[in-house]
Amino acid sequence: IPLAWWATARLLRLDVPVRAQSDGETPPGKSPLFDRASVPLFLSYAGAGLGYILPMTFLPLLAKDQLPADHWLLDGAWFLAAVATILSPSIWNYLGAKIGDLPALRMNFVVQLAGVLAAVILPGALGLAVCAALVGSTFVGTVMLTQRIGRALHPHQGPRLSAAMVSVYGFTQMAGPWLTKQWLEAGGT
């Protein structure tokens, strides 16, 4: 709570200048949010939301089905994912600065895919541990890199773009488990 009070006091002291607008300029927020440049980013971000939430939602269930009752990964898979999540932002930030945000985001998606496939292809504890570490390591990187790319595409859309992308990501994270349930009840595997 003291940190929250300190942060609030600092935020209240911020002096954010109002941007002057020329007559011929489109007012911020009045140009389209979805266009040829941003739609692929939104769609890939939605896919990343599904790619993250599905393995993370069902990781404990997979662990329970594949491991003995006293195995440390029953609870430890979440710990591995958390440690990977904590360590990853600086890595993805470095890669984004070094090779560019778009190539880093593509790499992030490949790492996420490898993590999802590990849970399916590698049996038992190894697959679950690799899934937790790889998928966990991509979560914050996906968000950070996508937000930066979005702001580069539409610098004038800052808050609107961020809000729309967070909404898309959140929607897919809520819809993913429900869609999976429907799929499984319909006989899917």
What are these regions (language model features)?
Residues L87-D101, L184-E185:
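Helix-to-loop junctions at the C-terminal end of transmembrane segments
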Residues P2-S22:
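C-terminal membrane-cytosol helix-exit motif in multi-pass small-molecule transporters
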Residues P103-A118:
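Structural signature of the two symmetry-related core transmembrane helices
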Residues A37-I86:
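Extracytoplasmic gate region of multi-pass secondary transporters
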Residues A46, F79-V83, A133, A163-F171:
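Transmembrane alpha-helical cores of Major Facilitator Superfamily
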Residues H154-G188:
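A late C-terminal transmembrane helix in Major Facilitator Superfamily
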Residues V140-H154:
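Intracellular juxtamembrane helix-capping segments at the cytosolic ends
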Residues L126-L134:
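Paired small-residue
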